[in-house]
Amino acid sequence: MLLMYPPRNRSLQKSKPKYLFAGLGTMGFPMAGHLSKNPNLDVYVFNRTSKISDKWVKKYHGAKLLSLNSCSIKFDGIITCLKDDASISSVILNSGLLKSIKTNAFIVDHSTTSLDLVSTISNHPDILDKKISFFDAPVSGGEVGAINGLLSIMLGGPKAKLSKVKIVLEAYSKSITHIGPSGHGQLTKMVNQLCIASLIQGLSEGIALGSKSNLNMNKVLEAISGGAAQSWQMDNRFKTMIKGDFDFGFAVDLMIKDLKIALNQSKKLDLNLSTSKSILKNYNKLSLSGDGNLDTSSLIKLLG
């Protein structure tokens, strides 16, 4: 079923490429918004919580789907940004959505997922039969990057089909790096998350030491932020960590999910990532204490 919200002009009625963006969470909401600003595209959105879709269509130029099961529209591309493997499987593989995508179209998944899911989608009979190009395209840059359209995209998929998806990805990114074939985007995101987790652990321990030593932490930041210790985490989280402000950003529970994916992959490769295992235990402690929705920088609370 399709519920059309009247666009601000009648341009949606023209014959233009049609794209569906599924998943209007913290990241997906503004990403779909940036995509809708392209006057040469028809953008449709879907979210399991319908009131979020209602909010989106009131703010941006587009229409919403009430259901994926009985959609009569034929899409040129589908973009997903969802929570986990189960959510993505439900939307892409088990909703009937593949009946609503054109032959030779594309699917771009911005979620962080397992390699097994990438393989399952890429090799699904309907994907192969309709010659659909699937790209695993996890992102980095957080909520701020999504809002400002400045995400970094790690892309895995068929290089020959890149031109198809660039019109979408360029709407909300500052960089698009094609890493390699299917799965390489997710592998790169695993590397990214392991690095970030270690940075946050180190930053937490450094701030804890400085604070317990009664240092002027603003002066400490001034002294070290221009040197080798500088990082995005330091620039954007140092001051909020000092204040104990964690009610924003990338949630602890999502980092737990991402670290589990990375550590599962490392196990398959006979790698013992002891530091990452220890950090995962710390994040699990936070989650069990009720802090699973706080920003990952809340790791410092365990050192209080």
Language-model region placement:
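Hydrophobic residues within alpha-helices
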Residues: 31-35, 121, 168, 209
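Active-site-proximal catalytic alpha-helix in oxidoreductases
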Residues: 148-156, 177, 181-213, 222-236, ...
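Interdomain hinge/lid region at the active-site interface
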Residues: 182, 230-295
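NAD(P)+-binding Rossmann beta1-loop-alpha1 motif at the extreme N-terminus of oxidoreductases
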Residues: 2-81, 111, 143, 178
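Rossmann-fold dinucleotide-binding core
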Residues: 93, 112-194
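Beta-strand segments within the central parallel beta-sheet cores of soluble alpha/beta enzyme folds
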Residues: 23, 216-226, 277-281
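Rossmann-fold NAD(P) dinucleotide-binding segment
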Residues: 68-134
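NAD(P)-dependent dehydrogenase/reductase Rossmann-like domain
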Residues: 3-11, 15, 288-304
